[in-house]
């Protein structure tokens, strides 16, 4: 991992060199961009990497407000923050997770899952706090109608656009991390599934101008995932601790219900009542019946798939639990053979011979015939 002292050196630009120094390489790239801000010739290009693009001034009653919309240049900004996320990933791994895992003495399989849950817990907790702050400051909680009113929501505030760029950067950085962390081949398909699922939903909400609904749904989803990974980490520390898993199981089903309800209310009923129902990609308007059905179908299929995986894992967990309980009952039900009582002769042993209490041998002496 990055930033640690190494005694072994690898050939320059070899596979092992890149894996062990990927965060240092990323730090050098970020430093080059920051140095570019110091010179007038390269400052404009450097700002392209750092700041969100496509800003526009919208006149208001008092003054002008700067808003943003999306475009191809967002890919450059996302790439820059992918590199920054890789650096933060390495810092969390080395200075937090590695120190904790050394004390727990985990196996290789559990160590891999511990690192995965540790990284995702840090991300989900920070994303929940960030998302909640954006939702409160934008006033989406106090005015639920704002989720579909004035659609399409083409113009975004700085914090909303930056939040979406940060989310896309994090989940895109997870793809090369599968290579950098040397994830086992058996774990790669499972991790690719939820990475692609997040990328699909976040990109869809961003490009289809459903950013307000996307913020609410991400807040619900991230809160549930944070509870799951927290329960998983506590389980590694104490295998008998199942309370957080039980709490997560209850919250998981409720979250699926809330997500489906919000999606149906916003897309199925809210957008259906908006007057502007014309398919116009140039203006960012996708409020037509086929588009709404496609959005709802995507959300419903994703939630049904997550619920099916949850039920399947819970049933497997219960089967394993009852097998262990039945095995314990069988062991306790097996009758033990009664212990044989050995009759001890009076006296004590000396050199393998039983002596009587008066010091003589307990064996009967043969009388010599006269």
Swiss-Prot record:
GO cellular component, as recorded: membrane
Domain named TLC: residues: 112-321
UniProt-annotated stretches for the region Disordered: 332-370
Keyword Protein transport: yes
Broad class of where this protein is predominantly found: membrane
Pfam families xrefs: TRAM_LAG1_CLN8
All ranges on the Cytoplasmic side of the membrane: 1-22, 97-119, 181-191, 236-250, 309-370
Spans through the membrane: 23-43, 76-96, 120-140, 160-180, 192-209, 215-235, 251-271, 288-308
Membrane topology per record: Multi-pass membrane protein
SUBUNIT field: Interacts with COL1A1. Interacts with SERCA2B.
PANTHER family on file: TRANSLOCATING CHAIN-ASSOCIATED MEMBRANE PROTEIN 2 (PTHR12371:SF4), TRANSLOCATION ASSOCIATED MEMBRANE PROTEIN (PTHR12371)
Stated family: Belongs to the TRAM family.
Name of the protein described by the UniProt record: Translocating chain-associated membrane protein 2
Gene expressing this chain: Tram2
């Amino acid at each position: 991992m990055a930033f640690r002292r190494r005694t072994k050196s690898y050939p320059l630009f070899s596979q092992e060199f890149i894996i062990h120094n990927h965060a240092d390489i990323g730090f050098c790239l970020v430093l080059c961009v920051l140095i570019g801000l110091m010179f007038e010739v390269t400052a404009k290009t450097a700002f392209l990497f750092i700041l969100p693009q496509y800003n526009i001034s919208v006149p208001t009653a008092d003054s002008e407000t700067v808003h943003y919309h999306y475009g191809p240049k967002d890919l450059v900004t996302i790439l820059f923050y992918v590199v920054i996320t890789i650096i933060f990933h390495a810092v969390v791994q080395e200075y937090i997770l590695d120190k904790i895992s050394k004390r727990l003495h985990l196996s290789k399989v559990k160590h891999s899952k511990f690192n995965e849950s540790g990284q995702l817990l840090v991300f989900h907790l920070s994303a929940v706090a960030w998302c909640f702050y954006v939702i409160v400051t934008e006033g989406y909680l106090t005015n639920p109608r704002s989720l579909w009113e004035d659609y399409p929501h083409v113009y975004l505030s700085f914090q909303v656009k930056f939040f979406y760029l940060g989310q896309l950067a994090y989940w895109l950085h997870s793809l090369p991390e599968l290579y950098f962390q040397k994830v086992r081949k058996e774990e790669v398909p499972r991790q690719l599934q939820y990475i692609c699922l997040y990328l699909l939903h976040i990109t869809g909400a961003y490009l289809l101008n459903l950013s307000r609904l996307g913020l609410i749904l991400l807040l619900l989803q991230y809160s549930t995932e944070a509870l799951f990974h927290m329960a998983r980490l506590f389980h590694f520390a104490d295998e008998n601790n199942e309370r957080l898993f039980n709490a997560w199981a209850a919250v998981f089903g409720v979250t699926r219900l809330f997500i489906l309800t919000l999606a149906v209310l916003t897309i199925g009923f809210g957008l259906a009542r908006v007057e502007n129902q014309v398919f116009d990609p140039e203006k960012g308007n996708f409020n037509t019946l086929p588009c709404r059905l496609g959005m709802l179908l995507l959300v419903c299929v994703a939630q049904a798939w997550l619920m099916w995986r949850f039920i399947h894992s819970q049933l497997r967990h219960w089967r394993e639990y009852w097998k262990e309980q039945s095995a314990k009952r069988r062991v306790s039900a097996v009758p033990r053979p009664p212990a044989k009582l050995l009759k001890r002769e009076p006296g004590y042993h000396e050199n393998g011979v039983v002596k009587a209490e008066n010091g003589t041998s307990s064996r009967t002496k043969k009388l010599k015939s006269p």
